[in-house]
Design a protein with these regions (language model features):
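NAD(P)-dependent short-chain dehydrogenase/reductase
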Residues: 136-188, 195
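Adenosine-cofactor binding site in Rossmann-like domains, unifying the SAM/SAH pocket
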Residues: 26-45
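NAD(P)H-binding glycine-rich loop region in Rossmannoid oxidoreductase-like domains
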Residues: 40-77
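Catalytic helix-loop patch of NAD(P)-dependent Rossmann-fold dehydrogenases
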Residues: 76, 80-84, 104-147, 153, ...
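Mid/C-terminal beta-alpha module of Rossmann-like enzyme folds, strongest
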Residues: 197-250, 290
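NAD(P)-cofactor binding segment of oxidoreductase domains
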Residues: 69-97
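Conserved C-terminal active-site "lid" loop/helix of NAD(P)H-dependent oxidoreductases
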Residues: 220-226, 243-281, 286-290
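N-terminal Rossmann NAD(P)H-binding glycine-rich loop of SDR-like oxidoreductase domains
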Residues: 3-20
Length: 290
């Protein structure tokens, strides 16, 4: 049984991957209390002792405001931590999966969807951190994959962490009768975290390289929120009361474009459900709709 170490293993993605694949692999799902990735000696010592076959590096600080307010801390985790893990992987001969982000393109003036070969122009600190790691990994490792995730969504599961995501947040807001603000000028892929986990395991059989990873979606965030409310059976008048079109941050002149082109991944046999289909399937799987 091959051993997988997952940093960020207590998080939204990591906890589900560990739960899904613990019968096929020996999985060490590590949280920040288990391993401080900013401590180079600790990272090297742990990985040398465990001798994993794979390391999935999912630890990171994605919160935009935190990254702005604490840029040194964010860089220590998002950049230094990733490079320490990569060096340890090289030392022990482990294959590394580095989880990157769609936010590499939030500063691009070109229209998406973006391909892996397109020039990344990150605006946010998190995207800049991820790009720096992507650029430095080839100097450290040969055997690695970079996966650029879309935005993940999912529902609560026993023993797993729930993260901020469009599906669960929309359902909660509807239940609590709270207004939901969303822009018609924000475009990004949105993927079921469990479908991500299924396909992430398949990635381990693919050639090394960089892959855009997740569901294709051409609808705005506003349209997706409306779709979710319709799917869970809210009446039209209730949807109109709850859903507020908010274009204060993004507009026709300032569109947020984060869509990724997944043609390369599809050519290797990994195909995600489109976002709306993935949302429908998730709601059906959890018994929320029939």
């Amino acid at each position: 049984m091959k051993k997988i170490i997952i940093t960020g293993g207590k998080g939204f993605l990591g906890s589900r991957f560990a739960k899904m694949w613990n019968n096929k692999y020996e999985i060490k799902a590590l949280g920040s209390k288990d391993l401080d990735v900013t401590n180079e000696d600790a990272v090297m010592k742990y990985i040398l002792e465990e001798k994993p076959y794979y390391v999935i590096h999912a630890a990171g600080i994605p919160n935009q405001q935190f990254c702005i307010d604490n840029s040194e801390k964010a860089r220590a985790v998002n950049v230094d931590g990733a490079l320490y893990v990569a060096k340890a992987c090289k030392k022990v001969g482990a294959k590394m999966v580095f989880t990157s982000t769609e936010q590499l393109f939030d500063g691009s003036e070109e229209e998406g969807p973006y391909k892996e070969v397109d020039t990344a122009v990150p605006k946010a600190v998190y995207g800049k951190n991820k790009l720096e790691v992507e650029e430095k990994l080839p100097d450290i490792l040969d055997e690695y994959w970079v996966v650029r995730f879309t935005w993940l969504f999912g529902l609560p599961e026993r023993g797993c962490t729930i993260g901020v995501n469009i599906l669960w947040d929309t359902i909660k807001a509807a239940y609590l009768n709270q207004p939901i603000k969303a822009s018609n000028y924000e475009f990004r892929g949105m993927s079921d975290v469990n479908e991500i986990c299924i396909n992430l395991e398949k990635l381990l059989s693919l050639p090394y390289g960089t892959y855009n990873f997740g569901s294709v979606n051409n609808d705005s965030r506003y349209e997706i929120v409306r779709f979710i409310l319709e799917e869970i059976g809210l009446e039209k008048n209730r949807i109109e009361e709850l859903l507020i079109e908010d274009n204060s941050k993004y507009s026709k002149e300032s569109i947020r474009e984060l869509r990724l082109d997944t043609t390369k991944l599809q050519s290797e046999g990994i195909v995600f459900s489109p976002t709306k289909e993935a949302i429908h399937n998730c709601l059906k799987e959890f018994g929320i709709i029939h």
